């Protein structure tokens, strides 16, 4: 028989419960004190008399990172940072649409090798930028988007233009943070700038609520009641608000490092480089395809070009790598890429992806040995489990890899008949282009002929910005950029509407360059209003609008396959007159002055050199040049 346990004394559980309750209460109070910054405030005081504001901290970090321009469309949420940038000598360039500001920052990033910066106001100001931010993500452009926001205290309470902005931008940005205290502005922005350029470059987003940007006295006026409230609840609320405000500004103006943080850029290992050297050294018909990543810092374009010339392997150039070898270089192969890839025995994909542009890898021969190098592992191996397989996949910086590859292949040569075979195919294709340029069109001008004349007129110091479908697709075959980083297209996202923003960023980054924008008439509709921006800021750029009164790239497939041109028609609009209404110069090219194409182009150049933005409205007919081109 078991002896029953002695019953516990009735009051013995109470001290334990009391201890647990007290501990929980203390922990809760300590947590609340930490969140309110009460401990931080003991060591870092609030300068209540200061008229300084968080915008000054933003501007100081941007200046320390070498930022010279900030693109914006003004809004009350971000006014302090714009004013502070102006005071520190950072040029504030305001556009007529927020998406243009981000496109301009994208172009600035691509051409400068640093971070492009745009600032827009809260809510709809930010949502207007989503397309441009996604475009920058897919183009791997390091941009910093600064977004205004409602007060930290009023978020999720129905404030004006308050939405969950971080949720919108997390899928698009490498780094996505909302600043909650003034003292956090500097370290957050430094981390954002480093993240934008490290690894695979891309956009970053920093949300700046109004109460971390405006001065103490203004935030206090909005946040804390002027008269002390009566009653216990009122006093508790007042105490909470005063401490919340103090935490916002505690230590706000204490000195902090503002300069750049170290970047994390992946590099190929010596063993990987050596294996690639051995593969390429045995090649008989080597081929290289260079993409935009090859032009990323730290490798300069001049060093990369010298390395490619030393290597002696024929190249296809895409994206920002277009123009790397200049005009008519013997190693630069421009046409018949699919056929060349099928014939090559070793292919180096240097910053090039097997997406739709390489038919998802289907254009690569299974008998070819493929070396692929890319900073992004996921992108590097895209579709490799389906249509192609790399012999060597190297995650690392493309430009640095090419330089190391050339070092390992010193003295290596390849039979000249392989390059000559590819160049002969180029010459045959160019002959067909000349024949198409000579063909009459039903009305207006032959776009192939016009673009050949553009190619002959284009100066060596030009930067080409291309924005459109059919007209721009034709230009890609006929007009050659004169050097590296002199061709700006949207990239893999295929975005229409990049033209004005890209031109804006390009001209400010390279003021001595002539910026030539090639627009389709459909795409030009997105950019027309920004000629007001060019006029106001005295930014002379030249726009050539291929005006065939339609969305022709879509119409080419829609009409024969579906039997209707619905939604594809536009008008032969007087875009040159519309530009003149905005204060720019406007010129017209049509069948009436078809013998003066070069003269009109020279007139446009001269007006640009005199400081005026110019639109040349080129009325063109339709040809079969791009029949069968991809529209989806």
Curated annotation (Swiss-Prot):
Binding site for thiamine diphosphate: 98
Broad EC category: lyase
Gene Ontology CC terms, in alphabetical order: acetolactate synthase complex; endoplasmic reticulum membrane; membrane
CC cofactor: Mg(2+); thiamine diphosphate
Disulfide bridge map: none
Protein name per Swiss-Prot or TrEMBL: 2-hydroxyacyl-CoA lyase 2
Enzyme Commission number: 4.1.2.-
Residues annotated for Mg(2+) binding in this entry: 521, 547
Region span, Thiamine pyrophosphate binding: 470-550
MF GO annotations: acetolactate synthase activity; flavin adenine dinucleotide binding; lyase activity; magnesium ion binding; thiamine pyrophosphate binding
Keyword field: Endoplasmic reticulum, Fatty acid metabolism, Lipid metabolism, Lyase, Magnesium, Membrane, Metal-binding, Thiamine pyrophosphate, Transmembrane, Transmembrane helix
Catalysed reaction equations from the record: 2-hydroxyoctadecanoyl-CoA = heptadecanal + formyl-CoA; (2R)-hydroxyhexadecanoyl-CoA = pentadecanal + formyl-CoA
Name of the coding gene: ILVBL
Organism: Homo sapiens
Family from the record: Belongs to the TPP enzyme family.
Function: Endoplasmic reticulum 2-OH acyl-CoA lyase involved in the cleavage (C1 removal) reaction in the fatty acid alpha-oxydation in a thiamine pyrophosphate (TPP)-dependent manner. Involved in the phytosphingosine degradation pathway.
Entry's Gene Ontology BP terms: fatty acid alpha-oxidation; isoleucine biosynthetic process; L-valine biosynthetic process
Main location: endoplasmic reticulum
Topology versus the membrane: Single-pass membrane protein
Keyword Lipid metabolism on entry: yes
Record field: transmembrane: 13-33
